[in-house]
């Protein structure tokens, strides 16, 4: 019998770079590294409601053949997989785990209270931040565990850090390209600060896969881009730090309602790049002012432009955070961050 089975959005055969797919693959890869390639089975939840009969069979296979069964659904999938896991577990008595992707669970439970009773029966629920855990504890959960988001990246060494020292300073966004991630605020802010200062102080590169619901709008936006704004496309995970290391700052003015511990923050820290982020959801737990970047309260394009103008007056102070950002990334290595899950799979509970 295998040690672990993972049911998640692998998107097998498809080139998907969204947060759910990336985290599902990252966690599974680390399980294989720590437990052994042959000790981990997978079931792909990609396909939506039409694929549910197939998914039910695949999950049953995991319960039959694995000591620990893990689910990693998005919010719609949670309504299907939580009851399914508990139904199968009446017969197989496995250790069942739920790894939360993003920061939407507490809000979702407010309108789906029937799920609370079900999720309390899981052996552990792994959330991405202390704030998320506290919210679940307020609802009476005693099985919530913090497992920070993590990525397997080619982190820089300290002597590989780059310190941009002249205008124009390179800025970037590095997330799914959609309005709710603050893409338009970033564009407007860079336009504003360059216009107000009368020169090209900043350039902006927009990296990431364009959300399918935003493709038409973004296509129109690109037609209006000045020379100092360009679209860089999607970047492979193993190239993120190499791509980011020369950038002066990463902009993350998100207001995406499902935001958790965003992987883009780990990408930035691993490249030694400080972040300018909105005070949204859980960003303030991970973007530490004076250490890894700056947080903007009630962020909008005007406030972002003001912060950028202030930073341009003292770029040396901004660059002084690059080393501390790189060191902070060590907390989110797969080896360290995955320990709560690995310990429980190996029977070392510490709730």
Predicted regions and their residues:
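Conserved donor-binding/catalytic core segment of Leloir-type glycosyltransferases
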Residues: 5-7, 162-181, 186-192, 204-207
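Donor nucleotide-sugar binding/catalytic pocket of nucleotide-sugar-dependent glycosyltransferases
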Residues: 120-158
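Glycosyltransferase donor-sugar binding loop
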Residues: 44, 203-216
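Acidic donor-binding loop of glycosyltransferase active sites
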Residues: 245-259, 273
């Amino acid at each position: 019998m295998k040690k672990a089975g993972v049911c998640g959005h692998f998107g097998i055969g498809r080139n998907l770079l969204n947060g759910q797919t990336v985290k599902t693959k990252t966690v599974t890869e680390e399980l294989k590294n720590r437990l052994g390639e042959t000790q981990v089975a997978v079931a792909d939840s990609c396909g939506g409601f039409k694929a549910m009969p197939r998914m039910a069979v695949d999950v049953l296979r995991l319960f039959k053949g694995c000591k620990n069964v893990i689910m990693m659904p998005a919010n719609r999938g949670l309504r299907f997989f939580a009851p399914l896991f508990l139904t199968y577990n009446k017969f197989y008595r496995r250790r069942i785990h739920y790894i939360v992707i993003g920061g939407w669970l507490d809000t979702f439970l407010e309108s789906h209270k029937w799920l609370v009773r079900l999720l309390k029966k899981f052996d552990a629920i792994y959330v991405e931040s202390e704030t998320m855990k506290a919210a679940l504890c307020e609802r009476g959960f005693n099985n919530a565990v913090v497992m920070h988001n993590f990525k397997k990246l080619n982190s820089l060494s300290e002597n590989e850090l780059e310190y941009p020292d002249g205008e124009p300073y390179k800025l970037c966004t590095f997330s799914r390209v959609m309005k709710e991630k603050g893409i338009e605020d970033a564009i407007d802010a860079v336009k504003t600060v360059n216009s107000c200062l009368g020169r090209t102080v900043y350039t902006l590169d927009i990296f990431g896969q364009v959300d399918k619901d935003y493709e038409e709008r973004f296509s129109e936006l690109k037609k209006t881009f000045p020379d100092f704004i360009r679209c860089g496309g999607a970047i492979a995970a193993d190239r993120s730090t190499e791509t980011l290391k020369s950038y002066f700052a990463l902009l993350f003015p998100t207001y995406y309602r499902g935001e958790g511990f965003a992987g883009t923050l780990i990408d930035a820290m691993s490249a030694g790049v400080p972040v300018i982020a909105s005070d949204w959801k859980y960003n303030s737990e991970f973007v530490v002012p004076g250490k890894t970047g700056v947080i903007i309260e009630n962020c909008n394009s005007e406030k972002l432009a003001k912060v950028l103008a202030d930073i341009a007056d003292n770029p040396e102070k901004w660059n002084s955070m690059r080393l501390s950002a790189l060191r902070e990334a060590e907390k989110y290595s797969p080896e360290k961050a995955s320990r709560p899950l690995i310990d429980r799979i190996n029977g070392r509970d510490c709730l």
